[in-house]
């Protein structure tokens, strides 16, 4: 009789636990749904810190298959918007590792390039004009190659048009940086260095406005070195580009 009572009590406890677990799962699901809708509204209203708080709550609930990819994507976007680039990058790496074939992986790669553009702008605006030649546009270069790869790998992405605009901006940014270095060499009468840097600019950024200015400094450098034939050829190229 005692054994039967023990089994009966165990069955009641087991059923109670099963019901409790089911109710807890349902509660978490309802809570996560509520928080997810709330954070979507917060993102729309640009309340990014509130959105991050709610998204992290959902993530910490460890809900199985509850829009985990969307939660991570929204977190990446929110961290990017509040300029928490390190955390955004960390989440990007986690996303790429977990969802390498995701339908919206192009969005993740595009945001990654935007983070590097933002990091470059942050550094660029903190550098005095006289010190620009000393700065290293590492993030601009990184973003440039990321976007080139992006445009090649995802030609049909909805972000391609913006990516091409960003590439145009980066070409201008990097060509002007190189031109600043070239000017520094010129004013210090390092004419060979001017010519070498000029050739690099013309090779990398031939379609930019910096290319014409580069030719002018190269022409002056060849004249200073008394290499008149080459200076004359460059002068003709400059005139042709004015037409």
From Swiss-Prot:
Q: Does the keyword Membrane apply?
A: yes
Where's it found, cell-wise? Cell outer membrane
* A UniProt-annotated Pfam family: YfiO
- Report the leader peptide range: 1-21
State the GO CC annotations: cell outer membrane
Please verify whether the record's keywords include Membrane: yes
List this protein's GO terms for biological process. Gram-negative-bacterium-type cell outer membrane assembly; protein insertion into membrane
The protein's UniProt keywords, in alphabetical order, are: Cell outer membrane, Membrane, Signal
**What is the superkingdom listed in this entry's lineage?**
Bacteria
Q: Which InterPro entries would you find in this protein's record?
A: BamD (IPR017689), BamD-like (IPR039565), TPR-like_helical_dom_sf (IPR011990)
Provide the family line.
Belongs to the BamD family.
- What is known about what this protein does? Part of the outer membrane protein assembly complex, which is involved in assembly and insertion of beta-barrel proteins into the outer membrane.
Q: Assembly state and interactors? A: Part of the Bam complex.
Q: What name appears for this protein in its UniProt entry?
A: Outer membrane protein assembly factor BamD
Task: Say which species the protein is native to.
Answer: Buchnera aphidicola subsp. Schizaphis graminum (strain Sg)
